[in-house]
Structures are given as C-alpha cells and as structure tokens.
Amino acid sequence: MLGYVVRRLLATIPVIGMVAFFVFSLLYLTPGDPAAVIAGDIATVEDIERIRHTLGLDQPLLPRFWAWASAVLHGDLGISIFTNLPVTQLIGQRVEPTLSLALCTLIVAVLIAVPIGVIAAWRAGKLIDRLVMLFSVAGFSIPVFVLAYVLIYLFAIELDWLPVQGYTPLREGVWPWLRRLILPSMALGTIYIALIARITRATMLEVLAQDYVRTAHAKGLAPSAVLMRHALKNAAVPIVTIIGIGVALLISGVVVTESVFAIPGIGRLTVDAIIRRDYPIIQGVILLFSTIYVLVNLAVDLSYRLFDPRIQY
C-alpha cells in the first residue's frame, strides 16, 4: 500500500509540472504585447517596459519558467500587477469564502444525490424514478448562472427569505454564515446533484441485477439491508469516482457563482484578474485549482480499497 501511494504521488509530479508550464506559457501565448495591453492606451514607453520587466517578458521563456517554478515551490506565486501585493496573500485572504461554499455544496450534494439515486434505482420505472431522471436532465442542462438568477428572484426578491449577495465569516455565527451560503450552494450544487444522482442510479441498477443481490432477497433479508449492505457497498467505487471527477464542476462553478452572488472568494478574484489582465493572479489561481483537482482524484483512487477490499495495491 505504501509503495503504491509513493508511486502515485511521484506520478503526479510530472502532471502538475506540465500544468505549471502551460499556465506560465499563457502569458506568452497572449495575442499582441501583453505589457502594452495591460498598460493601456495612455501608457508611456517607460510604463510598458516596466510592466514587461515585472512579467519577465524581457527574458527567454525557459529561464523565466525555471525561476517562476522555483519561486512557486517556495510558496511565491508572484506579485499582482495592479495591487502590487503578493498573489499568495491575495489568494489566502479569499480562501475561507471559497472553501465554505465548496464544502457546503459538496456535502449537501452527496447527502441528497446518493439517496435519491438509490431510491430511483430501487423503484426503477416508477414515478419517483421518472422524477429523479427528469431532475437529473434538467439540473445538468440549466447553466449555473441562469439558475442563480432564478433563485435570487424567487427567494431573495419575491419571498425575501434569504440575502442576495455577500459573505458572512463563520466566526460571526453559524446561522449568519449558513444563511449567506444557502442560495449559492443551491445554484452550484444542482448540477453536481444531478450528475451524482444519475451515476448512482445507473450503477445501482447494474448491481441490483446481480445474482448475489437476488440471493440476499431469497434469504429473506430486509430491503434496507439488501440496499445498504449488499448493493450500495458494491456500487460505491463508481459513485466515489464521479464525486471526485465532479470536483472540476465545483471549481468551474465557484468562479461563476461567486461572481453572481458577489462572494469575495477566489472565484471572484479570478474574474477580476481576467478583466484587468492581472496575469500573475490568473496563473496562481489556475495552478492552485489544477493541483487541487489532481490531489482530490489521487485521494479518490487511494480510497477505493475502503469500499472494495478486493482491490489490491
């Protein structure tokens, strides 16, 4: 087991390295002169040269990349062009809102999606199954920002039940913190719930058709015992896999959701950086999100043995 973990960790290094090189190269792939674009129309030649030097555009690509990668390994993601503050500091200041939104969405999505997927498979062809499938198709088809505006209009404007925008830190109270996250989590979590529920249903249908499940029924076991101890346990690996893959949906959805609900998180920081062409921030955020995605899927791979002891490393 330990040897497998070490090999997988070593295998992630070139993946993250390639991602880092691609992220760093974005600046050089930008059409035109990035320094002139950032400086604006009224900038002087000296201003453009200063920005070019700050971005390292006056140096060859590979030497600049090695210098940047070495700094990243020491926790230095560069300096923001517009605020002149370290990118690491700017990201660190916005971790809590993004982490709160992502964790709330993930937990609620799993707690809702897995049960309704199991029930839909158990009652295949019935009304509940059709409703779950209808929700899955609709939830996966509606863009996050469209659903967000619908929820804002319904629950914040018409019913006046929930606040529209902003974020309240957890230290100011659990309910104020949670109240600000309900609408964003609903908007972001719907597509995630739809995905997990659909995969759970499909996997459970396949497992419920197996001989050992029919044998468990023949022995007179309670339906709940058959579902939980025999069917769901053996369907866990594909479900856990799609939960890990769905982290990409969370990462991309966070950017849109934070922009709509004016949450001062990493997603909102990314949008502002894109608008202002603050490349060091864009590079730092993309590298951070890519690394998180790789590590989450590594953790998912390592967790398979917990759900299926037959898997050997």
Write out the residue ranges for each language-model feature.
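Hydrophobic alpha-helical transmembrane segments of multi-pass integral membrane proteins
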Residues: 17-22, 103-107, 150-151, 287
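Alpha-helical transmembrane segments of integral membrane proteins
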Residues: 2-4, 95-130, 144, 157, ...
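Short hydrophobic helices that act as membrane-entry/anchoring signals
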Residues: 3, 7, 63, 67-71, ...
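N-terminal signal-anchor/signal peptide hydrophobic helix marking the start
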Residues: 6-16
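Membrane-water interface segments at the C-terminal ends of transmembrane alpha-helices
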Residues: 22-29, 66-70, 134-165, 187-192
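An internal, D/E-rich "acidic patch" concept
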Residues: 58-114
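Residue-level recognition of pore/gate-forming positions within transmembrane alpha-helices
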Residues: 12, 20, 42, 110, ...
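Hydrophobic alpha-helical transmembrane segments of membrane transport/permease proteins
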Residues: 15-66, 82, 159-180
